[in-house]
């Protein structure tokens, strides 16, 4: 099996289990969950920086993209935790899962990536599933 596929599945497992525990915390205080996630992230970043000292990129364009990405991901995680506080994980999480379809669309438009027919069908089925989950509320 392709390494990227294995890593993608691991991401899904880690996000899935992590979001389950986040839902439990968010029922008490979504800001606390967000703060803990960011503190743990900073600690992990420091560990990585100590190990890989030449990881810093000084190219302005790449740095700008990295900052934009970080701001959007941080805001997205805060909104996810607040949504978990306000609603059911069974509704919020599938709705938030449309994010990868947005990434795919942007990658096709701007990075000129292409999809095979099975990939297109898979994305359409995911979107249909998300719609069905959201209207069943």
UniProtKB/Swiss-Prot annotation:
GO CC annotation, single: plasma membrane
Coarse class of the protein's main subcellular location: membrane
Signal peptide: none
Membrane topology recorded in Swiss-Prot or TrEMBL: Multi-pass membrane protein
UniProt-annotated location(s): Cell membrane
Parts of the chain that traverse the membrane: 4-26, 35-57, 62-84, 89-111, 116-135
Annotated SUPFAM superfamilies: Multidrug resistance efflux transporter EmrE
Top-level taxon of the source organism: Archaea
UniProt cross-references to Gene3D superfamilies, sorted A to Z: 1.10.3730.20
Coiled-coil region(s): none
Keyword field contains Membrane: yes
InterPro entries: EamA_dom
Keyword Methyltransferase: no
One Pfam family from the record: EamA
Keywords for this protein: Cell membrane, Membrane, Transmembrane, Transmembrane helix
Segments forming domain EamA: 13-135
Protein name: Uncharacterized protein MJ1333.1
Origin species: Methanocaldococcus jannaschii (strain ATCC 43067 / DSM 2661 / JAL-1 / JCM 10045 / NBRC 100440) (Methanococcus jannaschii)
Lineage: Archaea, Methanobacteriati, Methanobacteriota, Methanomada group, Methanococci
């Amino acid at each position: 099996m392709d390494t990227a596929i294995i890593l993608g599945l691991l991401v899904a497992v880690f996000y899935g289990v992590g979001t389950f525990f986040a839902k439990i915390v968010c029922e008490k205080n979504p800001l606390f969950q967000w703060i803990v996630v960011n503190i743990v992230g900073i600690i992990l970043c420091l560990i990585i920086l100590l190990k890989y000292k030449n990881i810093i990129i000084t190219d302005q364009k790449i740095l700008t993209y990295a900052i934009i990405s970080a701001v959007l991901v941080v805001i997205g995680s805060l909104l996810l935790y607040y949504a978990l506080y306000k609603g059911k994980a069974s509704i919020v999480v599938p709705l938030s899962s449309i994010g990868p379809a947005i990434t795919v669309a942007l990658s096709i438009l701007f990075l000129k990536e292409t999809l095979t027919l099975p990939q297109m069908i898979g994305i359409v089925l995911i979107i249909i599933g998300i719609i069905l989950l959201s209207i069943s509320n």
